Amino acid sequence: MLSKWIILFLIWSLPFGQDVIGEGLYEDELIGFLQENYKTSTTLGYTMARDTMYLRIDRIDGQVKGIYTNYSLTLPDGVDPSTHLYQNGSSNGINCEHVWPQSLYEGGEPIKSDMHALRPCKNNVNSARNNKPFDESTDTQTITWYWQNSQTSNIPSSNIDEYSENHESYFEPREDRKGDIARTMFYFYTMYSDIADEYFFEGQKEILKTWHAQDPIDEDEIARTWQIADYQENKPNPFILDATLVERAYFYDGILIGDLNEDGLLNILDLVMLVNIILYDEDGSPAADVNGDGAYNVLDVVMLANIILSQN
């Protein structure tokens, strides 16, 4: 009974409108559409882009926080942002993380300065991540755990989801930033696939898709991409505006997960159909298993609701 009321509450909470980018397009055709409409040819140049990110995009209440650790430094007015945050290169400083490593693409500007792919990062964590791919790290195989200003080689006894993990071969961001990282990676490869390392992307694609679903788009992420767009030809990261793009561009096999009425859209009608499948034990299509766990339950409803909400 509780599950039923949770499901009904989710439906009542949903708005009916939604924005669909490249409606009816899939795979290469959709990727081409995204490149044509969302790829910027104008950036600020790396020095100005980095300072703008620190001062105008990611300074909140006077603080700049690292993407992987939530570690923060105060950034006052009237100082050089990059110099002040860098702290002479100490481990407690903050520098600029290229979420897609610079060593894994060919070319300079405007790619290097595209703020959709840049994030503030604690100096020593940036060095630890280096150019490693993203993936899940088994706790017992994690070399170092990072959170705020602390690092440890021992499995944390509390707040474990707040830590990012450095493995010998890959890097795992903290739980509530995995979706942000995934959508950045899909953006970068989509816009710059002609020069980005294809094998680097293909090796991470599946886990990035999972993270995109598990850590859905939120209002802060939407606000940030539009702030960046103000400096880059009014072009946001489309993967933050339409949660269906990841699957439609890179995983489409004729079935759009969550599209139960097969109209090419994810909306309230699909949610109603999913609820009926769960409540009345009806046979469902593969599209109903939104979280990919092999079952139809309230978790699928929550995930589909998050996807629909993120498109509004």
Regions picked out by a protein language model, each given a short descriptive name:
Residues 255-259, 280-289:
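Extracellular-facing binding/remodeling surfaces
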Residues 27, 31, 35, 119, ...:
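Extracytoplasmic/secreted envelope proteins and their assembly/folding machinery
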Residues 4-14:
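Sec-dependent N-terminal signal peptides
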Residues 15-20, 247-261, 311-312:
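Low-complexity, Pro/Thr/Ser/Gly/Ala-rich linker/spacer regions in secreted
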Residues 263-284, 293-312:
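Alpha-helical segments with a strong preference for the paired helices of cellulosomal dockerin domains
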